[in-house]
UniProtKB/Swiss-Prot annotation:
Additional comment: The two functions, Mlc binding and proteolysis, are clearly distinct from one another.
Result for mutant: residue 213 to M: Retains 86% of wild-type protease activity with L-alanine-pNA as substrate. Decreases interaction with Mlc
Gene label: mtfA
Outcome of substituting residue 204 to S: Does not affect protease activity with L-alanine-pNA as substrate. Decreases interaction with Mlc
Protein name: Mlc titration factor A
Organism annotation: Escherichia coli (strain K12)
Binding annotation for Zn(2+): 111, 148, 152, 211
EC number(s) from the headed UniProt entry: 3.4.11.-
Disruption phenotype: Mutants exhibit increased generation times during growth on glucose, reduced transport of methyl-alpha-D-glucopyranoside, a substrate of the glucose-specific EIICB PTS system, reduced induction of a ptsG-lacZ operon fusion, and reduced catabolite repression in lactose/glucose diauxic growth experiments.
Domain notes: The C-terminal part of MtfA is sufficient for Mlc binding.
Effect caused by changing residue 218 to D/Q: Does not affect protease activity with L-alanine-pNA as substrate. Decreases interaction with Mlc
Effect seen on changing residue 69 to S: No change in interaction with Mlc
Protein purpose: Involved in the modulation of the activity of the glucose-phosphotransferase system (glucose-PTS). Interacts with the transcriptional repressor Mlc, preventing its interaction with DNA and leading to the modulation of expression of genes regulated by Mlc, including ptsG, which encodes the PTS system glucose-specific EIICB component. Shows zinc-dependent metallopeptidase activity. In vitro, can cleave several artificial substrates. The greatest activity and specificity is observed for L-alanine fused to 4-nitroanilide (L-alanine-pNA). Shows significantly lower activity towards L-arginine-pNA, L-proline-pNA, hippuryl-L-phenylalanine and hippuryl-L-arginine, and cannot use FTC-casein. Mlc does not appear to be a biologically relevant peptidase substrate. Biologically relevant targets may have a function in growth transition under changing environmental conditions.
The protein's assembly and partners: Interacts with Mlc with high affinity.
Length: 265
């Protein structure tokens, strides 16, 4: 029998957090009871260690907080919560937000412009999100804002900037870079053939290695059936890094559902 961590001594808490309801999103339904229990344990610690800061009138209730924490902890389910130790706050806008962006062109001229962002991740600062895109991250669709920004945090543990290569053994770096760049080239070829809107993988993945790692991390957890057959070698590297196999998890869940359906009387 599974002992759910949020059910232990609930009477001791003034308000028990709604973990069971928080788990009832499509992205998390494939997890086993043991995995869900472990995920909740991590998420509870996450909420104790991190500060969720609602901005611009956004209302943050306990269910929303729990779901945000669960999504943050899914990528580190087997790595451990210490992999998320590079920040202390999560800033949450109600919708995509406008920021001032400064960049330098090829001849050294500095440009300033205002751009709309869904999220941001600073190496030694907070993660910035928006609720509209967080909600869109609940489905198993290939899009997940929180996992994307977490991937950037995991990426920067390997150095001063995001490079697309997370903290892995040095002997594996060359192979990782080879497979990641091959995936970027493949995605770019598809974009040139069918256009960005018709591409089967988010075109942002072709922009640079750091974004490729972040985007494919989204697909790894929320659309493994698209990632695994297309980039099998890179898929295995992701499985080894995250110490999870979401495709195997999905197949097991589907097999269980099929077995249950055939035994209904």
């Amino acid at each position: 029998m599974i002992k759910w961590p949020w059910k232990v001594q609930e009477s001791a808490h003034q308000t028990a957090l709604p973990w069971q309801e928080a788990l009832s999103i499509p992205l998390l339904t494939c997890l086993t009871e043991q995995e869900q229990s472990k995920l909740v344990t991590l998420a509870e610690r996450f909420l104790q260690q991190k500060r969720l800061v609602p901005l611009q009138g956004f209302e943050l209730d306990s269910l929303r907080s729990c779901r945000i924490a669960l999504l943050f902890c899914l990528p580190v389910l087997e790595l451990g919560l210490e992999w998320l130790d590079g920040f202390h706050e999560v800033l949450i806008y109600p919708a995509p937000f406008v920021v001032d962006d400064e960049w330098e062109d090829d001849i050294g001229l500095v440009h300033n412009q205002r751009i709309v962002q869904s999220g941001q991740s600073w190496q030694q600062g907070p993660i910035v999100l928006n609720w509209l895109d967080i909600q869109d991250s609940f489905d198993a669709s290939g899009f997940n804002l929180i996992i994307h920004e977490v991937a950037h945090k995991l990426d920067t543990r390997n150095g001063d900037r995001a490079s697309g290569v997370p903290f892995i053994p040095l002997r594996e770096v060359a192979g990782w870079e080879h497979d990641l760049h091959a995936a970027m080239n493949n995605i770019q070829e598809e974009i040139e053939l069918v256009g960005e809107n018709a591409a089967s993988i988010d075109a942002y993945a072709a922009s640079d290695p750091a974004e490729c790692f972040a985007v494919l991390s989204e697909y790894f957890f929320s659309a493994p059936e698209l990632f695994a057959p297309r980039f099998p070698s890179l898929w295995q590297r992701f499985c080894q890094f995250y110490q999870q196999d979401p495709l195997q998890r999905l197949h097991h869940a589907n097999d269980t559902d099929s077995f249950s359906a055939t035994n209904v009387h």
